[in-house]
Design a protein with these regions (language model features):
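Short, charged alpha-helical interaction segments and adjacent helix-coil junctions
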Residues: 2-6, 63-72, 166-288
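Conserved single-residue anchors adjacent to enzymatic active/cofactor-binding motifs
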Residues: 1-204
């Protein structure tokens, strides 16, 4: 079946902002049965924390379970640090004064990278709960967590229920999916939501925009790399010239000292005194 790739932000949001899909995904990855009736996209807070206006691709608040779940999709060079910052921003937004630093809601962030690098793994976690340094036992005091998942790294060792979700996302990247290998209702719903023939004109337009933006970023990276190479070569040439000049000066000074030593020798000065005065070894000025 032909589908739109989940690497596109617009397609990922189209599929995972569906409440049923979002809840099933969170249940399988976090073990939480969310009580929600909507999923927000491009969520941001009225008063940003610090100098960054953090935005959350997909955001849901469950007041009954007292949790916030954010799902982030886009890949950045500062991938791990960026989404740690966003996660902490969601925590800090809840602290109103110095009387109580405990957030009302536990924050969970799931970061999905469809362009994983060789340094990534299928699933990695930052767990904020303190651990006893000696027994390694968790204190069960802080429950905030961040999951970084990379579908490109799914393999036969990836356990369920994670594996089927990761395989679905990975399979979509070449825009072809064999839906017969999937059996979970919510996963089949994702397949249905991203069918090529079900895309709206707005979906297609945004996909083209994202493709153009990605091309531009790659072009800028290539240009920056080229500029860096040229700068490195120029600095190498400049350094070589500078070293050459320094060596030339050193050689000239040594040659001048040698001439002085020879002149002093011709005037009858003792060899030891000439060595002390010029710093030139007698083997050099006694050769002639």
């Amino acid at each position: 079946m032909q589908v739109a790739s989940l690497r596109y932000e617009v397609i990922f949001k189209k599929a995972f902002c569906d409440v049923e899909v979002f809840k099933a995904f969170v249940k399988d990855f976090l073990g939480i049965d969310l009580k929600i009736d909507k999923v927000e996209t491009e969520k941001k807070y009225e008063k940003p924390i610090g100098n960054v206006d953090s935005r959350f691709d997909l955001h849901a608040e469950d007041l009954e379970n007292r949790v916030i779940v954010d799902i982030q999709h886009r890949r950045y060079p500062d991938h791990y640090d960026r989404f740690l910052h966003y996660h902490c921003a969601a925590l800090l937004q809840q602290v109103e004064n110095a009387k109580n630093y405990s957030p009302n809601l536990t924050v969970f962030t799931i970061v999905v990278s469809t362009s994983g690098t060789k340094e990534d793994v299928a699933m990695a976690e930052i767990n904020f709960d303190p651990i006893d340094c000696f027994t390694k036992k968790a204190l069960n005091k802080i429950h905030h967590r961040i999951l970084y998942i990379s579908p490109k790294h799914v393999n036969e060792n990836t356990p369920e229920p994670y594996r089927q979700w990761l395989e679905l996302i990975k399979d979509s990247l070449d825009e072809e999916i064999d839906e017969t290998i999937y059996h979970k209702h919510e996963i089949l719903k994702v397949v249905d939501l991203i069918k090529r023939d079900g895309l709206t004109p707005q979906d297609r337009a945004r996909m083209k925009d994202e493709y153009s933006e990605a091309e531009l970023r790659e072009k800028e990276k290539a240009e920056d790399f080229k500029k860096g190479q040229e700068k490195g070569r120029q600095e190498g040439r400049d350094e070589g010239i500078e070293i050459g000049i320094e060596k030339g000066i050193e050689k000239g000074i040594e040659k001048g000292k040698l001439e002085i030593a020879k002149n002093l020798l011709a005037q009858g000065l003792p060899v030891e005194l000439i060595e002390q005065t010029t710093g030139i070894s007698r083997q050099l000025f006694l050769t002639d």
